[in-house]
Amino acid sequence: VKNTRSSEDIDKFINKRRIYDILGQDDAGAWIAKTFPDLIYIRNKEIYGWGPSDEWVKENVQSKGALGTKYPNRIWATEGDSPAFMHLMAKGLNNPDKIDSGGWGGRFGLTKVANIRGMDIAQRSGVDESLYDPYFMFTNTSEGNESINRWKQHIWNNLSAKMTWTVTSTCDDANHHPIAIIGKDSTMQIIYLSAESGSKVSLDAGMSYDPDGDNLTYNWCFYQEPSSYKGLVSTDNNKSSHLDLLIP
C-alpha cells in the first residue's frame, strides 16, 4: 500500500479499515499496529466463556440436516473466534465505529494500550512481538468476557434457529426473530435522543411484531457499564411495550 499510494490515499485507506483480533495468534497484529498507528485495531483478550456446551451443539446444530453433520466436534472452544464476526452485526447497542458501546462482539475501551501480547502458543513458536514495541491497540474494558456473556443466550437462540431454517421446506415451518420497532423506526440504526436532567423520555415499542405470530414479551434495561452515568436508573415498567424513563 505504501508503495502504490500517496500519503493522503493511505490515510483514506486506513480510515476504512477495522481489524478485530482474537487473542493475537502470531506477530502480524503487532506489525500492523506499529506500521499503521492510526488504524482501529482491536485485540480481544477476554473472549471465552460464552460458548454453548457440547451437548447443546449436538442437539441444536449437529442434529440438523446435512449442514449440521458438517459441524465439527469441539477441540478447543466452540465458536471461539465468532465474536470477531458478531462485532459487525447490528444487535443491541453494537456499532463497529463505537467500540465502547457493547454488543455481541464484546466491549472495548477508547484508549489504546501499549504492547498487548498475543497467545502464549504464538510466543512458544518463536514469534517475538516485542520487536515492534511500542505498538498500540484497543482492548477489553474491565467488563471482560461478561460483555459477551450477557448476550450468550440470544446468540445461541440465533444459531439454533438458523440451523432449523436449513431443514424446513417453507418459511412458516421455522421460527424467526421478532421485529423491534421504537416509535415508527423499524431500522437497525441506533436511535439518539436529547433530553435534560429531570425530564421524562417516553419509549414506545408497541408497533413491534413477530413474523410468526408469536406473542411478544418486553424487557427494557439500562446498560450501565458503557454509560457515563453511574447512578441508578428506574425502569419500573420495564415489562411493558411502553417505557417512561426519568432522566437523572
What role is predicted for each listed range?
Residues 233-239:
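Short beta-strand segments within Ig-like beta-sandwich modules, predominantly Fibronectin type-III
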Residues 1-202, 208-211, 215-230, 242-245:
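N-terminal acidic, glycine/proline-rich low-complexity segments
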